[in-house]
């Protein structure tokens, strides 16, 4: 089972990726982790990546595709994999198709922007302990104070509304065309595309996934 999981930051991809991995026994392939692992392993491709990154340049699509091909040949990918963070663009998706990397399912978690903004910008964190609160869904007993220590809570920069909206804009600019690309491929029978309602509870989304992917 080879899966691409699409969704905006804050749509719940991480939670559902863990569910898929556990239920179906497949591994998650993150391009960031893959690049770091290749450099650490010192493979020929890894040495190329290290040189490019050391020069402050972006790793080319061709090189990332070569790394993906190398990664999916490994034993732990025998039952399948879940691609995280790749492809992001149509040229990357085309390069995957040209490299004969077949994808069984493209799953898109859809959540309205305002829902995501509320979900993320409402977070407050007690930095020393890592405890996370939410102004609406899990508020502290005293506003902006940690329940255990009474210390101040922090709104992280990544959780600020302006930052969230910038990330959402970038996501939509990159991904709208990619979603249409995979819808067209699904119509041709090259893959299967499904859109899921990410505003539902975690369990409800997981149930949607189970009905699509089948029981393990």
UniProtKB/Swiss-Prot annotation:
Its EC number is 2.7.4.3. It is found in: Cytoplasm. One of its GO terms (cellular component) is cytoplasm. PROSITE patterns: ADENYLATE_KINASE. AMP binds at residues 31, 36, 57-59, 85-88, 92, 156, 167. Pfam families: ADK, ADK_lid. It catalyses: AMP + ATP = 2 ADP. Keywords: ATP-binding, Cytoplasm, Kinase, Nucleotide biosynthesis, Nucleotide-binding, Transferase. Residues 30-59 are annotated as: NMP. Monomer. Catalyzes the reversible transfer of the terminal phosphate group between ATP and AMP. Plays an important role in cellular energy homeostasis and in adenine nucleotide metabolism. Belongs to the adenylate kinase family. This is Adenylate kinase. The gene is adk.
């Amino acid at each position: 089972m080879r899966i691409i999981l699409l969704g905006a930051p804050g749509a719940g991809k991480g939670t559902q990726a863990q569910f898929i991995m556990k239920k179906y026994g497949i591994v998650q392939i993150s391009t960031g982790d893959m690049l770091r692992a290749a450099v650490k392993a010192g493979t020929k491709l890894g040495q190329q990546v290290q040189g490019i990154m050391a020069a402050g340049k972006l790793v080319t699509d061709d090189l990332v595709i070569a790394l993906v091909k190398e990664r999916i040949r490994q034993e732990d990918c025998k039952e399948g994999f879940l691609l995280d963070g790749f492809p992001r663009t149509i040229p990357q998706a085309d390069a995957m198709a040209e490299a004969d990397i077949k994808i069984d399912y493209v799953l898109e978690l859809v959540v309205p922007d305002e829902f995501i903004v509320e979900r993320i910008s409402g977070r407050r964190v007690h930095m020393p302990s890592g405890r996370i609160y939410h102004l609406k869904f899990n508020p502290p007993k005293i506003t902006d104070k940690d329940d255990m220590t009474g210390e101040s809570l922090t709104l992280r920069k990544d959780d600020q509304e302006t930052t969230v909206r910038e990330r959402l804009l970038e996501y939509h600019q990159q991904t709208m065309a990619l979603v249409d690309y995979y819808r067209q491929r699904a119509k041709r029978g090259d893959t299967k595309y499904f859109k899921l309602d990410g505003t539902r509870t975690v369990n409800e989304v997981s149930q949607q996934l189970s009905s699509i992917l089948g029981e393990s």
